[in-house]
């Protein structure tokens, strides 16, 4: 069992139609056909959307995505029209809202890996390959991959697992031309992101991108980009291959839920418990730190304080 512990009730805004409630984002349509994406403070782990939120998380994700869209705009166009909430939207939508072009989404999670960890490490340990890409022998948790590899996955619904697939499987389902285009753009975006992050003392271990077709038939970058929710960021100064790496994402939440302290059994059908304040505060601080280190901006420019 998985999904929402407490599924939120959509906000009613004049002129907007609620379309979907995701793990983190709520999606609405305007009367003129644009999409409105609102990033909440919800957090997910182990396929559950947890009952505890991380304050300001949605604003940090949105503002970081906007910054990255600017850094990547010469590689591929993106779906953003505006970051101004529609008229009549709640005050809380400020800083966490994107008005976007409506796209025909490609049903593939486009994952790039520059370091071996997570599900990629598990697959490599079992088979010597990740998503059909053979890798050298002797790699360990945290090993750097040069060149980075493209490891796509099918996109799952809330509460379901994404399925890692090979490039050949993507080609069979969607055509070889699109498969190769997705691979090329994903790796180009990853390489740019890795270079920028390393200059700021952060390793971009892996990340995922989503793409869609616009009305002109052009491939466009969509959703969130290079955030702690879609990526693994590691402090460069603490990187030590052969062990789990310290991270700027929600790993502290996963660790607590997996600990005896939480009292939660992942294999049961029991929903996960609320997070303690210390875990919430630590997670929030990590999101703020990675935002500020990457962008060079302070979080208070979108009304976020450190306390």
From Swiss-Prot:
Highest taxon of source: Bacteria
Recorded GO MF terms: ATP binding; phosphoribosylaminoimidazolesuccinocarboxamide synthase activity
Pfam families: SAICAR_synt
InterPro entries for the chain: SAICAR_synt/ADE2_N, SAICAR_synth, SAICAR_synthetase_CS
Example GO BP: 'de novo' IMP biosynthetic process
Alphabetized UniProt keyword annotations: ATP-binding, Ligase, Nucleotide-binding, Purine biosynthesis
GO cellular component terms, A-Z: cytoplasm
The reaction(s) this protein catalyses: 5-amino-1-(5-phospho-D-ribosyl)imidazole-4-carboxylate + L-aspartate + ATP = (2S)-2-[5-amino-1-(5-phospho-beta-D-ribosyl)imidazole-4-carboxamido]succinate + ADP + phosphate + 2 H(+)
Enzyme Commission code: 6.3.2.6
Database matches in CDD domains: SAICAR_synt_Sc
Record-linked SUPFAM superfamilies: SAICAR synthase-like
Similarity section: Belongs to the SAICAR synthetase family.
PANTHER family noted in UniProt: PHOSPHORIBOSYLAMINOIMIDAZOLE-SUCCINOCARBOXAMIDE SYNTHASE
Protein name: Phosphoribosylaminoimidazole-succinocarboxamide synthase
Source organism: Thermobifida fusca (strain YX)
Gene: purC
